[in-house]
């Protein structure tokens, strides 16, 4: 007669699998911290063309190629009149 601890056949193999996992436990994706790669949030957006990347914002808020609307001639004249 067969042992009760190790039954025979395919059903026995299924029941007798060891409970300890032979590989380290993998953390589920919900516990992983979100990726900080810069591309992760920009997927699906078209790439900037070279023309857009060359246009660059200055400190006064004007982009490259725009003329300032307020002429600064008065300030230069005042500076030149100082002794």
Curated annotation (Swiss-Prot):
Family, as annotated: Belongs to the papillomaviridae E4 protein family.
Amino acid composition bias (Basic and acidic residues), ranges on this chain: 42-58
Extra remark beyond the main annotation: The major E4 form is first synthesized as an E1^E4 fusion protein from spliced E1^E4 transcripts, such that the first few amino acids of the E4 protein are derived from the N terminus of E1.
Chief location category: host cell
Keyword check for Signal: no
Key words of the record: Early protein, Host cytoplasm, Host G2/M cell cycle arrest by virus, Host nucleus, Host-virus interaction, Modulation of host cell cycle by virus, Phosphoprotein
Name by which UniProt lists this protein: Protein E4
Hydrolase listed as a keyword: no
Renumbered residue ranges of the record's region Disordered: 1-83
GO cellular component: host cell cytoplasm; host cell nucleus
GO biological process: symbiont-mediated arrest of host cell cycle during G2/M transition
Regions of compositional bias (Acidic residues) in chain numbering: 63-83
Functional note: Contributes to multiple aspects of the viral life cycle including viral genome amplification, suppression of suprabasal cell differentiation and egress of newly formed virions. Induces host cell cycle arrest at the G2 phase by associating with and preventing the nuclear entry of host CDK1/cyclin B1 complexes. Inhibits cellular DNA replication by preventing loading of host replication licensing proteins MCM2 and MCM7 onto chromatin. Within the cytoplasm, associates with host kinase SRPK1, a splicing factor regulator, and inhibits its activity.
Residue spans crossing the bilayer: none
Subunit structure and binding partners: Assembles into oligomeric complexes. Interacts with host CDK1. Interacts with host SRPK1; this interaction may favor expression of late viral transcripts. Interacts with host cytokeratin components KRT8 and KRT18.
Compositional bias (Low complexity): 28-40
Species, as recorded: Human papillomavirus type 1 (Human papillomavirus type 1a)
PTMs per UniProt: Phosphorylated by host ERK. The phosphorylation triggers a structural change that enhances keratin binding and protein stability.
Compartments it resides in: Host cytoplasm; Host nucleus
Coiled coil: none
């Amino acid at each position: 007669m067969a042992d009760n601890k190790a039954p025979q056949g395919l059903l026995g193999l299924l029941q007798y699998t060891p409970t300890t996992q032979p590989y380290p436990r993998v953390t589920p994706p919900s516990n992983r911290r979100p990726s900080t790669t810069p591309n992760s949030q920009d997927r699906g957006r078209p790439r900037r063309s070279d023309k857009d990347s060359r246009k660059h914002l200055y400190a006064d808020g004007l982009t490259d190629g725009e003329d300032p609307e307020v002429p600064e001639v008065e300030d230069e004249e005042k500076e030149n009149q100082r002794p």
